[in-house]
Structures are given as C-alpha cells and as structure tokens.
Amino acid sequence: MYDISGWKHVFKLDPNKELSEEHLEMICESGTDAVIVGGSDGVTIDNVLHMLVSIRRYAVPCVLEVSDVEAITPGFDFYYIPSVLNSRKVEWVTGVHHEALKEFGDIMDWDEIFMEGYCVLNPEAKVAQLTDAKCDVTEDDVIAYARLADKLLRLPIFYLEYSGTYGDVELVKNVKAQLKQAKLYYGGGISNAEQAKEMAQHADTVVVGNIIYDDIKAALKTVKAVKGE
C-alpha cells in the first residue's frame, strides 16, 4: 500500500479530455508520485474505465477523485472524496456523500478512501459554478476553512483549488502554517516549472492538470521542479 502523505507532485487527468497514448505514457513514467483521475463534468463510467485500464499498464499509483457516484469503479489504489467546504449547496458538503454511503457503505474499503476538504477560489472555474462555491472570501475565511478541515473535521487533505488560474502564493503559505495534520494540496493555473516550484515551497502536494493538454513538455518539467530530483 502506498503512503499518500509523502506525495509531493501529482498529475490530474480529466477523463472527459483527449490524451494520446504517447502522452499518457510520458505522464505515467515521469516520476510523478501519483495520477488522479477526476473532472467536473462529462465524467462517465466508460471514460473512467478507459483511463483506469490505460494507466494500469504502468506502475504509478492511481487515484479516482469521485465527482459522480455513477462513475465509481473498483481497481483504483485510492478514492478521494471531495467535500466543497465553501459551497452554498449542502449536497456538495455532505449531501451526495450521505447518499453514497446509504447505497454503498457496506461494501466500501475504508483503507482506500480519503476525504478532501476543498476550498474553491476561482469563481470562473467549472467546479465553482457546479458547486455554487462562495469564492469572494477573505484570507481569514480561507484560514477558517483550513482550520475546519484540519482541527474540527480532522480531514487528511485540505485542497486549495484555483482551477484554471494561478493562486495567491502568500495565502497558500499562510494556510499551510495553520495545518497540523491535514496535508495541503494546491491545484490551479500551473503552466511552467517555476510556478510549480514556487507553490511546492508551501503546499505539501502540487497538483498539475490543464497544462498537460496544452503543453506536455512544460507539464513534465513540473515533476523535477517540485521534487527536486
């Protein structure tokens, strides 16, 4: 079993986006600590299975970030369950989770499941619109969400999601200073190695996503930038 607490760099692949077999191989053989499969829309059991089968040809750990209960399938190493703490809709905080547990609770392997406390900070992002996230928040608000995840809910992961735009480095630094046991994941807008390295100075885990589809070479350079190898 892998230890997620040591992961510094992960790639996130959207099953609803096209990725060539050649580029997938580059991603999986890049030295990244893991590959997360997940997206905000168009996620189906068919495209999730396609990604799973493709990634399983390689040794890299593989995680399904669950956004649709209908697209869950066995075979992943871990399952990340996001709870959008700044959503205005209770369904994205605990609602869909309750429904899933009602249906699948008896057969779930709890050693494979990790809850993520999300704070979505880009109002233009699909995930913000889907979850009706309250993005016009102050630094004090974000720190309060971090404390909620870390100290009250005791979640293993607090995820700052800027999705599509590069985030506030000082805010990331200040949030990290508040966390005692939760690991800080940062995702959003990383388009080059320099940005990845900058965020890695503060976040425990840097998530690289969209740049994979825009500039595969730039995406691959983020691995060494984050891990310093």
UniProtKB/Swiss-Prot annotation:
Catalysed reaction, written as an equation: sn-glycerol 1-phosphate + all-trans-heptaprenyl diphosphate = 3-heptaprenyl-sn-glycero-1-phosphate + diphosphate
GO molecular function: heptaprenylglyceryl phosphate synthase activity; magnesium ion binding
Cofactor(s) this protein requires: Mg(2+)
Pathways per UniProt: Membrane lipid metabolism; glycerophospholipid metabolism
EC nos: 2.5.1.n9
Enzyme class: transferase
BP term (GO), one: glycerophospholipid biosynthetic process
Binding site for sn-glycerol 1-phosphate: 12, 159-164, 189, 209-210
Keywords on record: Lipid biosynthesis, Lipid metabolism, Magnesium, Metal-binding, Phospholipid biosynthesis, Phospholipid metabolism, Transferase
Residues bound to Mg(2+): 14, 40
Membership in a protein family: Belongs to the GGGP/HepGP synthase family. Group I subfamily.
Assembly mode: Homodimer.
Record function comment: Prenyltransferase that catalyzes in vivo the transfer of the heptaprenyl moiety of heptaprenyl pyrophosphate (HepPP; 35 carbon atoms) to the C3 hydroxyl of sn-glycerol-1-phosphate (G1P), producing heptaprenylglyceryl phosphate (HepGP). This reaction is an ether-bond-formation step in the biosynthesis of archaea-type G1P-based membrane lipids found in Bacillales.
Protein name (Swiss-Prot/TrEMBL): Heptaprenylglyceryl phosphate synthase
Annotated organism of origin: Bacillus cereus (strain ATCC 10987 / NRS 248)
